[in-house]
Every structure is written in structure tokens, then in C-alpha cells.
Regions:
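Short helix-capping/linker turns of helical repeat alpha-solenoids
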Residues: 21, 34-38, 50-52, 57, ...
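Terminal, low-structured helical/coil segments at or just beyond the last alpha-helical repeat
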Residues: 145-180
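Hydrophobic face of amphipathic alpha-helices that form TPR/SEL1-like repeat modules
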Residues: 43-50, 79-86, 113-122, 136, ...
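N-terminal leader/linker segments that initiate helical-solenoid repeat arrays
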Residues: 1-35
Length: 180
């Protein structure tokens, strides 16, 4: 799934911390990350991901993103899902990718819903794909580019679905949102 290669996500849910961590030097980030601060773990992951002030190391990037993801930081959950999906810094694992995408989607990240939709579409589960594309147009942290892409995908998928299947997919999307 190389569509996931551009996997940097900005930690929108920790905006107050973001400015502080985004400007910290690597040594300070490492101290804060080791102290368990999810925002610092996320930004340290980006340093390793791109080789900014450290040697590029995708395994270290994955480890720090996962530490932040496991504390509930949705942009980190999205990154971990994408890294599992593509086998970047970790062995490729579709079920783990799905797990982390679902966590990020449950936190309202429509980019994660979009990734889940693409996974379903690759499996030719068009109703499931439609459901996730539908969710990606109305999840909490809305990315306008994702909304536009999702609307186009829904239109294309509708050609392969009956009106009843589309209604069912939308109903499932509604139920998924209500369950969150």
C-alpha cells in the first residue's frame, strides 16, 4: 500500500504541546519522550523518520510513534497504521495496520477512515469501502483533501453498489459513529 508512504501526521489533538515540542532540540525531546510525554515521542519519531538532527532510522521512528500511539495520540496512531501497512520500520502487518487505523478513526481522524476505506476497496469489499469513505467525510479532525478524495471514491463505488447497499453502508457508518 505505497499510498501510505507520505505518513507524517501533525498532532492536532495536542496543539498546545505541539509548538513546544516542534521547536525542541533532539536532546530535550529525548528526555521528554523517555519521561513518557506523548507529544515529545511523536516529534522524536518525526526526527528519526526524516533524519532531522539524528541519523534517519525508520525503526526508531516506528518505536517512538508507537509509544505515542499507545498513549492515545491519534496522529501517532495514524502513522503507526501506515507504517504497518507499508512495512516501514516494522514488518508489514495488515491486521495491526487496521487496528491502529481504527484507533485513530475512533479518535475522529478522517485520514485513518480513508486508509481503512482503501484497505476494504483493495479487498473488493465495496460496501465496506463505501462505509469508511462515508466516515472519512464526517469524522472529527477533517482534512479537506481527504473529504474531496472520499467524495470522488464514493461516487465511483456507487456504480458497483445498489441503492440498498449504499443505504446499508451509510447506516453502518452512523452506527459506528454512535458507538464511539
Amino acid at each position: 500500500m505505497q499510498a501510505h508512504a507520505d505518513y507524517i501526521a501533525q498532532p492536532q489533538s495536542v496543539a498546545s504541546q505541539a509548538a513546544r515540542f516542534s521547536t525542541m532540540g533532539v536532546n530535550d525531546l529525548q528526555k521528554a519522550a523517555k519521561a513518557g510525554q506523548a507529544g515529545a515521542q511523536f516529534y522524536l519519531g518525526t526526527h528519526y523518520q526524516y533524519g532531522k538532527d539524528v541519523a534517519k532510522d525508520e525503526k526508531q521512528a516506528f518505536a517512538w510513534f508507537k509509544a505515542a500511539a499507545d498513549q492515545g495520540l491519534s496522529p501517532a496512531q495514524l502513522n503507526v497504521g501506515r507504517m504497518y501497512a507499508d512495512g516501514i520500520g516494522v514488518k508489514k502487518d495488515e491486521s495491526m495496520a487496521r487496528k491502529y487505523f481504527e484507533k485513530a478513526a475512533s479518535n475522529g481522524d478522517n485520514r485513518a477512515s480513508y486508509n481503512l476505506a482503501m484497505m476494504e476497496e483493495q479487498k473488493k469489499n465495496y460496501m465496506g469501502a463505501y462505509q469508511w469513505y462515508e466516515l472519512s467525510t464526517r469524522d472529527g479532525m477533517l482534512d479537506n483533501k481527504v473529504i474531496s478524495l472520499s467524495e470522488g471514491k464514493k461516487t465511483a463505488l456507487a456504480a458497483n453498489l445498489t441503492q440498498e447497499q449504499i443505504r446499508t453502508a451509510r447506516d453502518r457508518a452512523d452506527k459506528w459513529i454512535q458507538a464511539q
